[in-house]
């Protein structure tokens, strides 16, 4: 349980650190924003495949259980995509002002996409703590924490530029960080239920992260004409996770 609390504190703290740094970044060019998200996407791709799905196959002879877990994780995120709150409840602006601010609507949809994937990210870290392999356990947690810092910066700057108050923006970032903590506890609880269930949960967390990376993060990085920079940043993120897993 100590490892779970350490993982939760690390991931939550990394998101908040990124958010604080974001207050000092008044204007983040799309080129850098796409590169940062591409780097985060690379870490998530590596963490979901090398840190979760591959170990899941190695821990059981029932490969179909892992496949079911991967597909269930993707479907879970697909359903979450359909269940999003009214954006003006989050920003604190009245509905009319929100309708007239197309930039804010786009920013909030982007922030919601990041918030939604914090839950499966946390589940991935929580489930990996249940894994018998220490490298897998800390590799996934370190990888997610590393990408939480620039991701936190990416959340804060656009919100403030769109007119959301600094106080509300900071509380939004804290809420997003707490979603990840909830995911860690949920993932650890489900992964600890039985040794047979653990590979399914590893697959579930991996599938959810793959879905978010493909459906939300990569398309966002390719939407502003800087896809080459984002692609190389993704490769750098993937390599970072591989090297980090070897060193942990």
PLM feature segments, named:
Residues 1-248:
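Intrinsically disordered, metal-sensing/regulatory segments
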């Amino acid at each position: 349980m100590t490892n779970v609390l350490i993982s939760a504190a690390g991931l939550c703290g990394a998101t908040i650190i990124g958010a604080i740094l974001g207050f000092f970044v008044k204007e983040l060019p799309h080129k850098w924003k796409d590169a940062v998200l591409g780097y985060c996407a690379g870490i998530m791709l590596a963490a979901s495949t090398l840190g979760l799905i591959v170990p899941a196959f190695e821990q059981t002879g029932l490969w179909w259980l892992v496949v079911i877990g991967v597909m269930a994780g993707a479907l879970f995120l697909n359903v979450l995509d359909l269940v999003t709150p009214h954006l003006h409840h989050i920003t604190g602006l009245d509905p009319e002002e929100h309708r007239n601010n197309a930039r804010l609507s786009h920013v909030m949809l982007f922030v919601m996409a990041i918030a939604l994937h914090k839950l499966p990210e946390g589940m991935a870290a929580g489930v990996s703590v249940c894994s018998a392999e220490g490298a897998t356990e800390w590799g996934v947690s370190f990888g997610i924490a590393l990408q939480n810092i620039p991701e936190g910066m990416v959340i804060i700057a656009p919100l403030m530029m769109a007119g959301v108050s600094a106080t509300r923006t900071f509380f939004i970032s804290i809420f997003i960080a707490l979603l990840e903590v909830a995911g860690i506890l949920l993932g650890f609880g489900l992964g600890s239920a039985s040794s047979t269930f653990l590979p399914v949960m590893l697959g579930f967390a991996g599938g959810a992260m793959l879905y978010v990376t493909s459906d939300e993060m990569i398309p966002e990085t390719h939407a502003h004409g800087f896809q080459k920079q984002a692609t190389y940043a993704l490769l750098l993120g993937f390599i970072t996770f591989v090297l980090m897993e070897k060193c942990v």
